[in-house]
Amino acid sequence: MNEELAEVAASTRLAELGITLPAVPAPVAAYLPAVVSAGQVFTAGQLPFVDGHLLETGKVGAGVSPERAAELARVAALNAVAAAASVVGGVDGIRRVVKLVVFVASDPAFTGQPQVANGASELLLSVFGERGRHARSAVGVAVLPLDSPVEVELVVEASAASF
């Protein structure tokens, strides 16, 4: 394999970025944070929790700025990566990111959901490089659990060695 095309391990990228993979946030209801099926990992919706605390509440476009919401989407995406990593033996057990879904609690007039979702997408590209390129949906919704401004779901492919 061409050395220029060789991928850097996700754990190495996290260290280079100064990012520590957080503990998986505890579920707030009767579900699992992530499950593996047919070589893919599906995460539950992840909120922007840090150390057990939701960083912000409210709607984007009415109290929460789009820029702040993009930061929150990044935090929620990191929590989703942690959830996926927890069922495949660590972050290096993730072969590639397949799909990202970002739900944005939006004021009715707000239409910038894709820009909010970029916070999550950019984190995934930073951590996984080309393996972080993904399909994506950015969905505006009326309200999210706990009045969170954003919620993130991931589908990733697990590496064969993680089974």
Short names for language-model regions:
Residues N2-F163:
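Short, polar/acidic, helix-capping and beta-turn segments at strand->helix junctions
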